[in-house]
Amino acid sequence: GGRAHDIARGYAVKRQAFGKPLIDHEGVGFMLADNLIDLKQSELMIDWCAGVLDSGAPGIIESSMTKVAVSEALWRIADRCVQVMGGTGVSGDTVVEQIFREIRAFRIYDGPTEVHKWSLAKAIGRAHPGDVP
């Protein structure tokens, strides 16, 4: 996700549209800002989950939450990068197209997003008031 963002950012800074750099168009700038937010949230989720696992806790719920949050965020980031870059984003001219294609599978590996959400929903239903779920 970070590599695709860096490439899209560089493209948006250099590419001109309607007399100004793409980055100066609000829609493009907002997409790149959303990427930064998703990247930081993903980093924090991974660090949090790693801390839970390092403490010796099973981390089943935390792992599912992190897997869903990060894989969905990476998909959004890759999608925005393709959008920012237009046709170049889906061409072989940069690795953004490859990243976009490969990141899609992250939502399936180790259980699809929907299976993890189903598992989380069951945990929420079983939880007692004050418990984590």
Predicted regions span which residues?
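Alpha-helical interface subdomain recognition
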Residues: 1-133
